[in-house]
Amino acid sequence: MQVTFLGTSSGVPTRARNVSAVALRLPQRSEMWLFDCGEGTQHQFLRSDLRLSQLRRVFITHMHGDHVFGLPGLLASLGLAGSSSAGVDLYGPDPLESYLNGVLRTSSTRIGYPLAVHRVRDAAEQGTLLFEDDDFTVRCTLLTHRVPAYAYRIEQKPLAGRFDIEKARELNIPPGPVYAQLKRGETVTLEDGRSIDGTSLCGEERPGVSVVYCTDTVFCEAAIELARGADLLIHESTFAHGEAEMAFQKQHSTSTMAAQTAAEAGVGQLVLTHLSPRYVLGNPVTPQDLLNEAKAIFPNTLLAKDFLSIDVKPRCNSS
């Protein structure tokens, strides 16, 4: 998995940062998922090496404009490009469907591909899976914000052990489609009548990786529980520690709240995003100060910037 930040500002865009959007690339299946879609997100796609045609799922955290105003235009552009024959699944708060229907109806916009909207509230309240397929699961939880806001956890299922090609050759197993079956751990009967157990040719199962996307929220236990043991936590950091009172009033997080969440959850790496536009040139407090505050609590912390990409592994690497 690879995460690419398309927008890292809170509230409004700045010259350097667009509003919230994070793309999750799944290269093994030529697929991409999007988390939040602030205004201008489709422009950010054009400035990146991401392929919008691979978009398959969109997860919206909450209905504030800096997280959702870009969605109608992006979906309309997908339709005009004719590149979404497989359809798009949307996940989000209860009002998401009525919001989209209203915008599309009043603008006479026709979506010419399958579009399904899934409400996430029940999965969050009941602690059940929001999504599952052969490779991934997605869970969500309700955060503490002024409107219903949800964090998402994407978990890759365990991966099959590495296939021992040399051993397969020693057993005179002919290469071809049968190798794919054996790699999946299946038992295969060869043309010569031998029955080969694929698990005997594979190493130990490898753990998958996990990503948690957590915004908007003030410090809360629900975020800690959802993020527990994750490889990568993407957490909002709207304010510096010195503005904690404002953070509580507006129900946003400070840099130190994000770091405390990461530390208590025992995650592998923390990335700060959703920075207030006040931290620009001329302000005595800078984004670097927020990063330093967080690293004092949780050293393995990065500061997101637009178009930063991170390969999600048990030990994350950024580029």
Curated annotation (Swiss-Prot):
Transmembrane portions of the chain: none
UniProt-listed SUPFAM superfamilies: Metallo-hydrolase/oxidoreductase
Amino-acid positions noted as binding Zn(2+) 1 in the UniProt annotation, renumbered to this chain: 62, 64, 145, 216
Catalytic residues, chain numbering: 66 (proton acceptor)
Reaction equation(s) it catalyzes: Endonucleolytic cleavage of RNA, removing extra 3' nucleotides from tRNA precursor, generating 3' termini of tRNAs. A 3'-hydroxy group is left at the tRNA terminus and a 5'-phosphoryl group is left at the trailer molecule
Chain coiled-coil ranges: none
Cofactor binding: number and manner: Binds 2 Zn(2+) ions.
CDD domains recorded: RNaseZ_ZiPD-like_MBL-fold
E.C. code: 3.1.26.11
Pfam family, one: Lactamase_B
This protein's UniProt keywords: Endonuclease, Hydrolase, Metal-binding, Nuclease, tRNA processing, Zinc
Subunit structure as annotated in this protein's UniProt entry: Homodimer.
Xref: HAMAP family: RNase_Z_BN
Similarity comment: Belongs to the RNase Z family.
Protein name in UniProt: Ribonuclease Z
Organism per entry: Synechococcus sp. (strain CC9605)
Gene that encodes it: rnz
